[in-house]
């Protein structure tokens, strides 16, 4: 598993914990990403262990994320914030913090978040 993908998953763990718990739906998304990123069994074990306790953006190795991976993390974070049926205030707040931490320009971030929210809401209708 590439270091950038590891950092993306860790970032998503912090988003999942934003509302104080990790839902079953959020766990499913994280597990799917481990598979999609071809995590080795040892890496998957490490990330599952990492996800067992509350995490914040301070726990995310953002410096390991390149240009595209930063945007990927933001888009996945928005999706993850909706996967349990609704985006709550804590999840909105961590996405705003994530935009700052990822150093994505405000206008670009606004468009990425808006597009991701629209896709997330459409996907929710399919579930």
What is each model feature region?
Residues 1-127:
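Small-residue-enriched hydrophobic alpha-helices in membranes
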């Amino acid at each position: 598993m590439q270091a950038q993908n590891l950092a993306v998953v860790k970032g998503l763990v912090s988003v999942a914990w934003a509302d104080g718990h990790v839902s079953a739906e959020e766990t499913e998304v994280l597990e799917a990403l481990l598979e999609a990123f071809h995590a080795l069994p040892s890496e998957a074990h490490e990330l599952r262990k990492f996800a067992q306790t509350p995490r914040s953006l301070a726990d995310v190795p953002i410096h390991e994320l390149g240009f595209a991976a930063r945007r990927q993390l933001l888009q996945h974070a928005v999706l993850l914030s909706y996967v349990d049926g609704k985006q709550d205030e804590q999840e909105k707040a961590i996405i705003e913090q994530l935009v700052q931490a990822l150093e994505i320009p405000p206008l670009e971030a606004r468009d990425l978040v808006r597009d991701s929210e629209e896709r997330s809401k459409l996907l929710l209708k399919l579930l």
